[in-house]
Amino acid sequence: MILHNTDFGHILVGSGTQGFFGEGYPFHKILKPFGLNFEGYTFVAKTTTLRPRKGNLPLKTDGITPEELFPDCIKVYFRKGVVLNAVGLSGPGAKFLFEDGRWQKIKKPFFISFMAVGESFEIRYLEAINFAILFKKYLPSFSAPVGLQINFSCPNVKVGLKIPDPKIQAEEMRAILGIISSYAPIPLMPKINVLTPVEVAKEIASDPNCDALCVSNTIPWGALPHKINWTKTGVSPLAHLGGGGLSGKPLLLIVAEWVLNARKAGIEKPINAGGGILSPDDVDVLKGAAADSVSVSSAAILRGWRVKKIIRRANEIFEGE
């Protein structure tokens, strides 16, 4: 996937899969002897907000490391191939992360991920402005080309769910793309989920400041009941934290269908597609749907021993294009 004349590769890790700087998580060390290996991917940082955010994931005093090996806000169902999380964008805020300096030392093209989370559009717009000003300040010190994934769809923040009018939703996304682009002329890739109507995605993709689309973020608990078999009770095990967002096996065919419909609707911008990739063959499903690249995330938890093969398969089948 080439954006602004920079090759960002054929496979990205989902934002947060390896933390804010690629430091990973304690369970990665446990799975490494069993074959967990991220070599050959493009790094995407965990989504940050402008200001420090407590979220639902307790962090150590360094501001980035989870306190618990098995956090209460993440539920893993290995046999079903499903992860449910209500992390809620816990983090130290953008200023802390830029000042840390580790992003600036990365040597390969990568993505930072950002989300504005204010209660109103006016507040979210101001957050985007201030984030863009920060980015502009530190951008000259980066060693490698960097893109920005703008998260518009985290279900644990529920910002997008508060904008029921698709037209207003598209207008807000375009406004934020425009203001960030005016400060930081870098590749911009909005991250949406399959609940985003294709017509909204088409309007966003038509914006000159949109360089690619990323789909799909996790799905809010209980959404798409005609496609996802939720529990009989309909009660989320993370109901006390707002319900959480689902990732894993059920999303693969839903994402593939969304990408196919996006292409039929005339969306020509590159699409980075992910959701439910748990084996190398799953990459072929999204490639067949006309995705330009893929992203892998929940496989690192659910099928860690397959991650290396998934990355290899993605690089093989997209390389020939």
Where does each model-flagged region fall?
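Glycine-rich phosphate-binding active-site loops on the catalytic face of alpha/beta enzymes
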Residues: T42-L50, G147, F152-C154, A212-A223, ...
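Short beta-strand/loop segments at the ligand-binding rim of alpha/beta enzyme cores
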Residues: F8-V13, K108-F111, S181-N193, A262-G274
